[in-house]
Regions:
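Active-site and adjacent substrate-binding regions of carbohydrate-active enzymes
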Residues: 1-249
């Protein structure tokens, strides 16, 4: 498995040249798809997502993608500048907007992420935060806004619907199926306190996990829906990896 967080055009190198010569990895993290999904959530627009999917690098038939929404690492905005322009944006200000949206700098954003590895000279950075907190569930629960809670849950389901239907292997990060929020426990540990990625690497909350069996809870609503979607994925052969980039709109 290649956990290579590189430019879209570089990832195919980790698969090797062909099935015989320079055979490398059989599976690679689809970091580009992940970044494109987060772009669509922030912009409320699928233009860059559609463009980026069409231009994902070709891969060998023997290889496949590991598709995910969140993982243990930060979110890097690793989509291609040419795709950003084809979607109607300018690369630098567009990436700045995405970063600001998820780190609380954009007015009205419900996201509760933090910048990671920020370069003070260029303004470039990556994004830390749990899935639920980045889509606004933490903010919605704090305010008790039922409409916002519904919207956040629907976004969590929507994001997973893409990785469960896109060719490859879907990966669900621990805690995402019950809407795990950011944790600040890491700040009490001097060995990791300076690394805010630990806000989405918290200990699994088994007490909260029990609420997935209680009808109407946030945990139950997310977990039961994802469970149904996974079952559908298993029984639908059309979701296998046929390397088909045609988008039906």
């Amino acid at each position: 498995i290649a956990e290579a967080i590189v430019a879209p055009g570089e990832i195919s190198k980790y698969f090797g040249e062909d099935a015989i010569n320079a055979k490398e990895c059989e599976i690679a993290y689809n970091a580009t798809l992940m970044a494109l999904l987060w772009d669509a959530v922030a912009t409320k627009n699928a233009a860059l997502l559609n463009q980026g999917i069409k231009n994902l690098p070709a891969k060998l038939e023997r290889a496949t993608w590991l598709n995910y929404v969140r993982c243990h690492d930060d979110i890097g905005l690793g989509f291609d500048d040419s795709d950003i322009r084809l979607a109607g944006y300018e690369p630098a200000p567009h990436r700045r907007f995405i970063l600001d949206y998820y780190t609380g700098r954009f007015p009205g954003s419900p996201a509760r992420g933090l910048p990671f590895g920020e370069n003070p000279k260029t303004g470039d950075a990556r994004i830390s935060g749990s899935l639920a907190s980045l889509v606004g569930l933490e903010c919605a629960l704090e305010s008790g806004d039922a409409v916002a809670i519904d919207a956040a849950i629907k976004t969590i389901v929507l994001l997973h619907s893409v990785i469960l239907s896109f060719g490859g292997i879907p990966l669900l990060y621990y805690g995402d199926a019950i809407g795990t929020l950011n944790s600040l426990e890491y700040l009490a540990d001097p060995s990791v306190a300076a690394d805010n990625r630990w806000m989405h690497r918290s200990y699994f909350d088994w007490n909260r996990a029990k609420r997935r069996h209680e009808s109407g809870t946030v945990e139950q609503r997310i977990f039961s829906t994802l469970k149904k979607m996974i079952a559908l994925r298993k029984e639908t052969t059309a979701f296998a990896d046929f390397d088909n980039r045609q988008l039906l709109t």
